[in-house]
Amino acid sequence: MTTKMVSSHRLLTLMVFALLLIPMISGQSSKCTKGCTSTPECNIKCMKKGGGHCQAYIGRSHGRLAIENYCCCNNYSNSPISSPVMN
């Protein structure tokens, strides 16, 4: 009985670990920085990573709702398919 519980616990732990590790290994997570005014500006800033986009996030600042724009870069620098060809 205890071996069944231990093995199922290990399997569950391994599955959670794998689900957390996959996005980090693939490099598909986007890095976001504060202060985006437009998507073209963000694209230029993120050119080496395959482009980017402005993303608005709603959060609380000093007890009030605040909307802040972030520049989120696509992390496609290791992918030969998604990377733009620069001459």
Swiss-Prot record:
Location(s) in or outside the cell: Secreted
Disulfide bonds: 32-73, 36-54, 42-71, 46-72
The keyword Disulfide bond appears for this protein: yes
Signal peptide, first to last residue: 1-27
Sorted UniProt keywords: Antimicrobial, Disulfide bond, Fungicide, Plant defense, Secreted, Signal
Any GO BP annotation: defense response to fungus
Family named by the database record: Belongs to the DEFL family.
Keyword Secreted among UniProt keywords: yes
Name recorded for this polypeptide: Putative defensin-like protein 84
Assigned GO CC terms: extracellular region
